[in-house]
Amino acid sequence: MKSLIIGGAGFVGAYLVRHLKNDLGQDVVVTKMPRKQVKVDGVDMNSIQVCDLDILQKESIVALFREIRPDYIYHLAAQSSVSVSWKNPALTVDVNVKGGVNILEALRELEDKPRVLFIGSGEEYGHILPGETPIKEGNVPRPGNIYAATKVCQNMLAKIYADAYGLDVMMVRAFNHIGPNQLPLFVVADFCKQVAEIEAGNREPVMKVGNLSAKRDFTDVRDVVRAYALLMKSGCAGETYNIGSGHAIAIEDILKCILDHSSVEIRVEVDPERLRPVDVPIIEADTTKVYEATGWKPEISLEQTIRETLDYWRTKSI
């Protein structure tokens, strides 16, 4: 089997490459933006085909699909930061909505149509009403930020194309996924990086934090990519699947876990610059549907992921 990973140069893409290549023995092709590098620890990069691709150029997508002729396509390319979406909404809409439509339109032009997985986010559900958690796929999305709104739009478009044109397209709503090598744009990586820098003496023993009361559903990225691969085998076209742990935890509890693993005393300060204009109070997944389709459930504990992420940033701070 041959898998094409669109946007494989990022955090999740690297883990997906490793899983598909090393664990499943698939042929893997990765796309990246021009001038961006792809390096996956533990994978012989000579065995991976890497191609430049701008998903805002539809004809380039069509040409690549016809050249590669993949069996499976994982669409990971996205502007995936909520904070960046507030600062640059136009870019977020272009990449997440226009880019998604370009891929769907390119699929329509192919004679041999591959199976495709569009990656969305638990942020799509937005403002959850009392009694709606854990969140099922049938919950009405009420996106609370620009990033989430673009992913809702992408999900709806993918569903319409699957139904109208018979495309073998599935969608996931992946809740917060974390692990070593994640950019510090995201909360766990940010906290771990700050702690590691403090331990190394590279900054004052003060942590800057945002909203600590928000509750989120965290899953190790290695479990997440395993779910993606299982859905390629067993998921149903036109369907959306939640990927998460099924348990929400307050950000303040995440912070406590990280600080418990630290070797120094650290003071915590709320930084107004880190507070979002709107923040969803709780996001927690119901993962019954993906379990029934694939048998998937997370295997790596949150404590293990946090410990390994902190150790990763310690090596970067030496």
Model-derived regions: residue spans:
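Amphipathic terminal alpha-helices
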Residues: 302-318
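Conserved C-terminal active-site "lid" loop/helix of NAD(P)H-dependent oxidoreductases
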Residues: 43, 221, 240, 273-297, ...
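Catalytic helix-loop patch of NAD(P)-dependent Rossmann-fold dehydrogenases
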Residues: 87-105, 115, 123-171
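NAD(P)H-binding glycine-rich loop region in Rossmannoid oxidoreductase-like domains
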Residues: 55-95
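Glycine-rich Rossmann NAD(P)(H)-binding loop
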Residues: 6, 87, 176-182, 205-216, ...
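Mid/C-terminal beta-alpha module of Rossmann-like enzyme folds, strongest
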Residues: 191, 234-275
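NAD(P)-dependent short-chain dehydrogenase/reductase
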Residues: 128-134, 156-217, 221-230, 246-248, ...
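N-terminal Rossmann NAD(P)H-binding glycine-rich loop of SDR-like oxidoreductase domains
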Residues: 3-23
